[in-house]
Each structure stands twice: as C-alpha cells, then as structure tokens.
Amino acid sequence: MSDDAFLPLTSITDGLGCTLLLIEQAGRPDVWRNGKKHDGGGQFGMSANARGAWAGWGSIGFGPSGADGVSAATGDATDCTVNCNNWFGIYGFHHGGAHSLLCDGAVRFVSPTLSPLTFAYLSNRDDGRLVSAAEF
C-alpha cells in the first residue's frame, strides 16, 4: 500500500475490533529500550522515511524484538512485543503495558505478555485470523 492510498473500512475483513490502527511508541525521537533512554543510535534522524513524530519512521513497519530490546526477534518465547524498544514495537512509559487503538475506535492497554504471533494477527487487516479480546 502506498502512502497516499485510500483504504475503506470495508476492506478490513478481519473485523475492526481485531485490527490495529495506531500503536503507542513513546519517547521519540530518543531511543528507549526496556525503560531506559539510550544515547546515539540515531535511527529517528532525517531520512527518506522520516515523516514527523506522529507518522514517522514507525509508520513503515513494526514488529517484535529480542528480550533485550536490541536484537532481532528469533521466533521463540523470548521475543518481546510491548515496552521492549520504541523502534518497532508497542512502547509506553506506563507500568505494565502501552496503549493501542483498534480500527473500531477502542483503545486497549496491551500488556507485555502479548505474543508476537497475536501482534502479527492484529497488524493484518485481511489474513482471516480473528483475534479474541482474551488474547490481548
């Protein structure tokens, strides 16, 4: 999907309450990992993908990381989706989770126990994987 493409709500076939619209990624443009600010890194600097704090770098893609908030996800139980880092994942300064907005307008406080697979299902609008409220 390109930046200027229109996507009607009717194209979200997995359900508006099962699809992420926005996720919290607090602390930008600084780099945060597991509740600690890190100097350097500069991944939020001006680049072809930089579009401002509200629709910037993270509007391109997001996903889980390793438990340390730095390494890539490995596909096992140590992968982290919430409050690991503010590069790709859901990140907030709240104890026990961060906020996400679903396409139906509901705001959910998502805990760090959110599985990477459930995160992927919530990120896709038409993959046929319906996510129950108990899963996140």
Task: Identify the residue ranges that each predicted region occupies.
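Surface-exposed loop/linker segments characteristic of extracytoplasmic
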Residues: 1-136
